[in-house]
Amino acid sequence: MEGLAPDTAVLLVNLGTPDAPTAPAVRRYLSEFLHDHRVVALSRWLWCPLLHFVILPIRGPKVAHKYAEIWMAGGSPLAVHTAGLAEAMQARLPDLRVAWAMRYGKPAMADVVAALRAEGVRRIVVLPLYPQYSTTTTASVEDVVARLARDAGDAVRFDTIADYHVDPAWVAAVAGSIREHWAEHGRADRLLFSFHGIPQRLADASDPYPAHCRAGTDAIVKALATDAGFDPAQAVQTFQSRFGREPWLQPYTDDTLKALAAQGVKTVDVVCPGFAVDCLETLEEISLQNAALFRAAGGESLRYIPCLNASDPHADALAALVRRRLHAGAAHA
């Protein structure tokens, strides 16, 4: 990082997580998350009573039980792996300060930025850990960054990396994780790429997320196409985690798994390239819930391929992404 000022920091931002696998902690987290107009666009007078008097009392205990099934000794998997990724990137960016925060929950973005400013940081490269841009995720981080930038005035310069859905090093890292899985377990009958869904109305309103998912899947499949015995036709892209009654991006992951089982498909490998690190949606929804659903529908085995987490290829790819952004900024300074 020769030539870069030591007053520069990298801020990794992930979605967020409850502080504990308990109903009160989950309710606090979901309340903050579901109050974001980027996540739920209903009018506040209609949404807030529904959220606080119906959804949170019902979902709090249910979601807490799901978290309890995947909770790690060090805390929430999402927090543990995000911290590990920040540490791995710090080793690769020794002249910078690498920190991490959550959009919802703790550590809050505002608190981490305040701490960085107290350390003398004057430039912050914000890297939302969402490979694909969406108004429901990345734009919400950008909203907070805009508020923090207004508060900081000229004291801090913010620079956000909006997406990296076809970054060659990231694509190679995901493809490499799939190859490692195949080397240990062999290939399944199908390779399913499962992304978090968004409401179809947002896609209709030109949210780039569906196109980013498709482009990323195609790039990863192309990287795997050189492997002997892999047929790109075995790859399927789906969307998971829908919430509410309105249509979301399709095909749905759960419906696809049931359909594959009905067609006689016995084994499925599932990878989730929309998630930088493992979390509730991968470890519980895919690895436990959807694996059981696939077996109940007649399939034999759903093998979940872990997220990149704090792996060397992941840290290498994101550190290189940061380097390029910093050098591009220095060239135009």
PLM region spans:
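Active-site-proximal alpha-helix that buttresses catalytic centers in soluble enzyme cores
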Residues: 1-333
